[in-house]
Amino acid sequence: MKAPVIEVRDLDLNEAVRNVSFTVARGEVYALLGRYGSGKTALLEILAGLRRPTGGAVRIRGVDPYADRNAARAGAVWRDGGLFPGLTVAEVVDTWRRWTLDPLTRDRALRLARLTRLADVPFERLTIGQRRLLDLALALVGRSDVLVLDEPTAGLDTAAAREVWSVLRALAADGVAVVVTTRDPDEACRADRVGVLDEGRLVTGRDAARLRAVRPRAA
């Protein structure tokens, strides 16, 4: 069994997250499934280092994100995404690279997110799905081996959602540890493992294959 890259132990955040524990290995996609208000986004914000837990522990690459934020940094994609008027796709990535001082090249970030052919396209002309892929490219620039994504396919049509998941699976195959949140059981089935959240508690965790067996649409 691979050593975990993400470790969550007995995590609490007031009433939003309650005694949650799970691990994610390198090359694994882990889905947090739950309805609105179940604690998914709050948990992701803790993993991204944006909210300090009131109890328990988090380790990213073995490091406490609140002791060494840079060493434990994770790339993050939030549901609302970013707005970059007046810039092309390549210019957005270049600007982000300079801000984060990350050595990942612009061309590699675009290639990983499958945006190379759109490098010179203005941000305003991108579809919603393409904007989501751009957000993913920026998350890779920030820290490319651990990614957390808040409902990355929300609002996308079927083709765009498939493209996002195709990129995520390719990244996982390259060793990236991925955590996604979703309210859709069929979406969750695309992950390797699923944790079901209810009122801040992780009520079950299982292999996605078991869910796929009873939800054929996600196969």
Predicted regions: what they are:
Residues 33-35:
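The feature captures the beta-strand-to-loop junction immediately N-terminal to the Walker
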Residues 48:
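Helix-to-loop junction immediately C-terminal to a conserved catalytic motif
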Residues 56-72:
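Conserved ABC transporter NBD signature motif
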Residues 94, 104-119:
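Conserved ABC ATPase "signature" region
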Residues 136:
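Hydrophobic anchor residue at the start of the ABC signature
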Residues 147-151:
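Catalytic Walker B motif of ABC-type/P-loop ATPase nucleotide-binding domains
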